[in-house]
């Protein structure tokens, strides 16, 4: 009989590096066939956090051989001009993925912008058609953060079939697609949110917990079944200004079988899965 180990760290940095190496190899194979995967990244305005995210995405492209086209516009850019630029990128065969960094200035409708991106180039997986493909199990693009979470869960060796998974959060970008991906893996899924009466009641029964609400300490040790897999999507700051997640890491790691840290867990995986989606978009053009 094996004894249960607690607090095993799921290393997102190591897994990300492994997956990026695989992307680089597949990019070389595509280039040998005359196709270089191309990702267009559009930044509108001066949001400092967005600028950092975009820099990281462009660097990740450079590191793996993906061609990145970075377009930066003033915050005064009109909605019509942005939509026209997206239409031009949709028609450009050298561009396989299009990403508009959010948030965008208030005079531009984000829904219109996301919907303007061709479903074949929607590597963020946010558009309504992409969400429909995910819902029906069609082979579309999976949103990068939930896709990365699934890869992290895979590393634990847990067979999700019949397991109880609880997702805390119901956002269109993480919570809802996360629940769908877990369903596709044959888990029994419960989604908790701000109107859930007793989140702990549900999480204490869970074999897998994904916390994705953007609120510190939403999951504490008393809410976790011993040996559970805990994935922390949150990105917050503690009282000392240090990065922390939605999970009380120090407490929960004493109970959980596996847990992702913040930073170094889900974060690195999000950009990696963006590269994977862009690569797959390019591969589809030569199949």
UniProtKB/Swiss-Prot annotation:
Q: Which Gene3D superfamilies match?
A: Leucine Dehydrogenase, chain A, domain 1, NAD(P)-binding Rossmann-like Domain
> What role does this protein play?
Catalyzes the oxidation of 5,10-methylenetetrahydrofolate to 5,10-methenyltetrahydrofolate and then the hydrolysis of 5,10-methenyltetrahydrofolate to 10-formyltetrahydrofolate.
The record lists NADP(+) as bound by: 169-171, 194
Q: In which pathway does it act?
A: One-carbon metabolism; tetrahydrofolate interconversion
Mention one GO biological process in which this protein takes part, according to its record: purine nucleotide biosynthetic process
Concerning PANTHER family, the annotation shows: C-1-TETRAHYDROFOLATE SYNTHASE, CYTOPLASMIC, C-1-TETRAHYDROFOLATE SYNTHASE, CYTOPLASMIC-RELATED
Keywords (alphabetical) are: Amino-acid biosynthesis, Histidine biosynthesis, Hydrolase, Methionine biosynthesis, Multifunctional enzyme, NADP, One-carbon metabolism, Oxidoreductase, Purine biosynthesis
Keyword set includes Ubl conjugation: no
Q: Which HAMAP family has this protein been placed in? A: THF_DHG_CYH (MF_01576)
The family assignment reads: Belongs to the tetrahydrofolate dehydrogenase/cyclohydrolase family.
InterPro entries in UniProt: Aminoacid_DH-like_N_sf, NAD(P)-bd_dom_sf, THF_DH/CycHdrlase, THF_DH/CycHdrlase_cat_dom, THF_DH/CycHdrlase_CS, THF_DH/CycHdrlase_NAD-bd_dom
Identify the EC number(s): 1.5.1.5, 3.5.4.9
A Pfam cross-reference name: THF_DHG_CYH
Q: Which gene encodes it?
A: folD
This chain's protein is named Bifunctional protein FolD
Q: Record keywords: Ion transport included?
A: no
- Gene Ontology MF terms: methenyltetrahydrofolate cyclohydrolase activity; methylenetetrahydrofolate dehydrogenase (NADP+) activity
Q: Which GO terms describe its cellular component?
A: cytosol
Catalytic activity field: (6R)-5,10-methylene-5,6,7,8-tetrahydrofolate + NADP(+) = (6R)-5,10-methenyltetrahydrofolate + NADPH; (6R)-5,10-methenyltetrahydrofolate + H2O = (6R)-10-formyltetrahydrofolate + H(+)
Q: How does it assemble?
A: Homodimer.
């Amino acid at each position: 009989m094996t004894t249960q180990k607690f607090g095993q760290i799921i290393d997102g940095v190591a897994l990300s590096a492994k997956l990026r190496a695989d992307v680089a190899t597949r990019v070389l194979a595509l280039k040998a066939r005359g196709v270089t995967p191309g990702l267009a990244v559009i930044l509108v305005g001066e949001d400092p956090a967005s600028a950092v995210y975009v820099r990281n995405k462009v660097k990740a492209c450079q590191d793996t051989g993906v061609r990145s086209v970075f377009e930066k516009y003033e915050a005064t850019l009109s909605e019509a001009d942005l939509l026209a630029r997206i239409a031009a990128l949709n028609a450009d065969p050298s561009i396989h993925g299009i990403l508009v960094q959010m948030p965008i200035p208030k005079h531009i409708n984000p829904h219109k912008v996301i919907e303007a991106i061709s479903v074949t180039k929607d590597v963020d997986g946010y558009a309504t058609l992409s969400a429909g493909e995910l819902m029906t199990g069609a082979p579309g693009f999976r949103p990068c953060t939930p896709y990365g979470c699934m890869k992290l869960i895979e590393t634990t060796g847990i067979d999700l079939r019949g397991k109880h998974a609880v997702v805390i959060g119901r956002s269109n970008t993480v919570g809802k697609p996360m629940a769908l991906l877990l369903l596709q893996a044959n888990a029994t899924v419960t989604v908790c949110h701000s109107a859930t009466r007793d989140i702990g009641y549900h999480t204490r029964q869970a074999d897998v917990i994904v916390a994705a609400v953007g609120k510190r300490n939403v999951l504490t040790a008393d809410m976790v079944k011993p040996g559970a897999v805990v994935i922390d999507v949150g990105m917050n700051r503690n009282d000392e200004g240090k990065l922390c997640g939605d999970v009380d890491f120090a407490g929960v790691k004493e109970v959980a079988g596996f847990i992702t840290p913040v930073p170094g867990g889900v974060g690195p995986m999000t950009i990696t899965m963006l590269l994977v989606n862009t690569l797959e978009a390019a591969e589809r053009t030569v199949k």
